[in-house]
């Protein structure tokens, strides 16, 4: 995954792609937390970046749910 995905890039993705991105990010966060607990994590900042990315995905999904934003290329989800 790219470091620091912008909300604009996320808004261009379909709902299915966003859900897949969310699943991947949560899996990565789980692995990072496991590495932190075992003392193997070398980049602590990555935890924060992944958490922020998860929050951005949830925000875009919620915007679409409330009708504040449409899907990619103006499609309604």
UniProtKB/Swiss-Prot annotation:
GO molecular function list: structural constituent of ribosome
> What Pfam families does this protein map onto?
Ribosomal_L29
Q: Name one GO biological process term.
A: translation
Q: Which GO terms describe its cellular component?
A: cytosolic large ribosomal subunit
Protein origin, superkingdom: Bacteria
Keyword annotations: Ribonucleoprotein, Ribosomal protein
Record-stated family: Belongs to the universal ribosomal protein uL29 family.
Q: Entry's HAMAP family? A: Ribosomal_uL29
What is this protein's record name? Large ribosomal subunit protein uL29
Organism (species): Mycobacterium sp. (strain KMS)
């Amino acid at each position: 995954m790219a470091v620091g995905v912008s909300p604009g890039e996320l808004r261009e993705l379909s709902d299915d792609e966003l859900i897949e991105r969310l699943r991947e990010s949560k899996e990565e966060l789980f692995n990072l937390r496991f590495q932190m607990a075992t003392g193997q994590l070398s980049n602590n900042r990555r935890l924060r970046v992944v958490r922020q990315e998860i929050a951005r995905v949830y925000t875009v999904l919620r915007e679409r749910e409330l009708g504040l934003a449409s899907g990619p290329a103006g499609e309604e989800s």
